């Protein structure tokens, strides 16, 4: 394994997805680690982090992971995603875990920045060496999601996304900034695992996959480990059972365990909030200030150990949360953390002849971190199309 595979990606890939001429639909997954978007023009992702900079901040040259946000009303400027992470040292204590990963983060300035950046990213398309905003004043409709046990927070999430938005983005290697001025009147929130179930049942053109009937009629579990939570979503013959959310099993816990192992082995403090940039190289640095010495230390094996430990705990939780597991036919594994855990899950459950483990990206082959957001988008597309046909 490579540690950089655990770092949240920064990308936007232009491609044609099913669209509708009466609404601009945006699927947005505001994860604790990464923000994912899906629209008729493509899909993209960036780390869920932003850092305010001076208004005269400039970069020496555009970078592939560059995202700079400017509020068109206040002039406030923020670095977003990987660049914001990269300029922040491991000793920076300005961001607490509660600010970044707390359940009630909706009213923080950072959450506003990353959610508006996501809205803008879902409106762009590559045009030669630049990106351009191609929303043609259609009504903006957003479909997003929350962990099963957090659905009572839906109104607070909607409140942060509704209304008027005016900002500018400098994106990636594009030479021209892009302005966005639009309103959002409709925001829909669904349980996160439902997004993956919809994604696995629907093809890119919005029609049902040939195997969708199996997933809708059999006993199915959606196993959705995210950054902050593990969602277990049982479905029996099309009837959705009460889901289960564990807020201590996910990639955040993996990084917390890794941080503790690094401290124990190398006596280096790397808090979870600063771990992302070190995943790029898989190395941390010890610094002897008195004698002007420094040394790098590889933590790949420590990350692998922590990843396996937390995955095993998650599977133990699955066993306890679903006592009749042997009666289920499919276990759908989804999310970026699910992709990191998939080999362990397949090996651990290989003795269950009656249960088939399925990756949620099986009919699109996008990275599994996009499974929920793809499902968000296609579910809203299907709902609007169904309404039009009535």
Indicate where each model-derived feature is located.
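Nucleotide/phosphate-binding catalytic cleft detector across ATP-hydrolyzing
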Residues: 1-220, 240-242, 247, 251, ...
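Short aromatic-centered micro-motifs
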Residues: 37, 234, 285
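A mobile "lid/hinge" subdomain adjacent to the ATP/sugar-phosphate binding pocket shared
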Residues: 264-305
